[in-house]
Structure formats: C-alpha cells, structure tokens
Amino acid sequence: MFIAATTVAAFTLGACGSDAASAEGSVMRIGVTQGVPTDLLTVVAENEGFFDKRGVNVELNPPALTNAVAAAVISNDLTVGSMVPAMLWPAIEKGACVKALGSLVGNTMDVIAQPGTEIAGDPADPDTTMASIKGKTIGVTARGAGMELWISQMAQEAGMDPAKDITFVGVGAPATAIAAFKAKQVDVLYYGPTMASQLSESEFVRVTDIIGKPGNALSGLNHGYPTASCSTIAERPNDVMNYCKAMWDTYDFSQDPQNAAVMGKWMAELTGVAPEAGTAAWEALKEAYLPMTITKESWEEQAPLAGSPAPTVPDFASSVYEPCAGGDPR
C-alpha cells in the first residue's frame, strides 16, 4: 500500500541523518510543505515574529514531498515537521520514537463533479449526496494517499462500497488535477478553496460543502500533527516548549478578525495563488484551523481516516507530548 511504503522508507532513513536534536538554542529546522494550506500557522508564526518573541531561532525548510517530512523528522534532519496519522502511526509502530506536539488543521477538502452531474441531497451532508457519484471516476492526488481514504470514508458512510462503486485516479497536485478535470479525464475531483482562482464555481457542481463544518465523516480529521523526535524533546525542552507557545500565540492571532488580511497574505504566499485568492481561501478555511490541543478522543478518532483497514491506534500517552498538546502552556 502507498502509505505503508512511504512510512517504511521514512523509518529506514531514520537510521542515518544529522544530529539536529542536540543543541538547545540552536536553529530549529521546521518543515513546511508548499502549495497546500496545512502549514499556514507555521509560516505566519515565522513571518509575523511569534517565534522571535518566544526566543526560538527558526529556519523554514520546504521538503520536496510530504512523505519526506516523516523521514526528516525521524532522522533529525528536521526539528519539527507536520505528519498525518497515516505516516506518523506506522512509524511509531515500527519503532520510531517521535511525538505529536499538537494539532494544525482539520479537513480542507471538498468533492466536486463535472457540470451537469445530477447531485441529489444537501452538499453539507455527504451522507445524502455521495451516492450520486456511484460509478464515477474520482481524481485524487495519488492512489493510496490520505485523500483516497477520506473520500472512501464518506462513501462508506453513505452506504457505498468504495472498492466496487467508485474508481480512483491519481491526478496529482491542484494544477494538474484541474487540467485533468477540465479535460474530462475524471468525473469527480477533490477541491479546496485555494483552487478557486483556477476553477470557479460555475465550472463544477458541488458534491460536498463540509470544510469547517460539524456532523460529517471528516469533521474530526486532523490533517497534520507537528511532530518531533524523542531526542529533540529530551535534549531541547526549552526550545520545544517555546515553539509550542509561539504556535499557540499564532493560533490566537489567526482567530482575530482584525488579522484576516495578514492571514490571507500568507495563505497566498504559501499556496502560490494571487493575493485576492489567498484572502478568499483564508475566509473559506479559517474555521478548519485548530488549536494545538490533542485529546485522547480526537487521537483515536483518526483511525478510520489513517488507513484501510484502520491501523492500530498508538498509545496516546507515549505518542503525544502532553506539556504542549495537553492544553495552553503559556
């Protein structure tokens, strides 16, 4: 399976790498994946001075691939990197000593279909609409990746069998995905607000409208945990806690309506869209961003969204860094 393969690679790489964990007060190398909104709060924390205010010396490092973050955190080439449960959990199971420091963002994805597709039901309730795409081809970033799991989960909750009733097609990142959709190479596509400037509402029909909304299969999704190795946490406790405090500061900043323009600016920078598109994307996504807290319940809730079949949930107490994720440490 794709997810398992990337995680095995990450764990294997953990045997080598630099000793980034060793020096308290030295540069913290933090992974930031460009082109997607996951690491927005990290970008804001650096560029709006929240890391500086907490005395954290940070260098943002964009990895080439999302799965490269897992390898880099485990090997200490990155001090902190955001990892989805589908990569974090298998790494822990295979013996990697890493801990989740907090939460970043929930679901940022909707599902759309070609113009003219008959969609029955309410897009805010996927249980009523997903059956309308039975028999369709669905474009996802890559086969076996998290996006396929999440759409499959919505299909299952709507009474479908994803293995039989829908066909997934890997179409890549937004630019190539949109091109494939416009060329009608797929019937259905993943969709997020950062894609709006390239694919307007008039060019599709909505299957779902659930970003930042409760009561659906993806309401509890955590799209990324900022994660550090156990050696980093043990050897740089002050740096790690100041990083955590800065991220809590940034979340508070993001939730103040007076800062919407700033959030839109950095959304545009991170995702590579025009400034006005960044502002619109922030407005659409702001409810999806999460405080750093991780609860045992929310941790266990990731299981059906982390693999198929659902993986074993790692022990919460030993896999989550409670001083940061247990509540506001400031």
Question: Predicted regions span which residues?
Answer:
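Short, glycine-/small- and polar/acidic-enriched structural segments
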Residues: 23-163, 168-171, 187-193, 209-210
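C-terminal motif of bacterial Sec signal peptides marking the signal peptidase cleavage site
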Residues: 11-15
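Pocket-lining segment of extracytoplasmic ligand-binding domains
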Residues: 176-267
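Conserved C-terminal helix/tail region of periplasmic/extracytoplasmic solute-binding proteins
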Residues: 303-330
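Sec-dependent N-terminal signal peptides
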Residues: 1-8
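Short, solvent-exposed loop/beta-turn-alpha elements that line the ligand-binding surface or hinge
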Residues: 53, 120-124, 212-219, 286-296
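Secondary-structure end/capping motifs
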Residues: 234-309
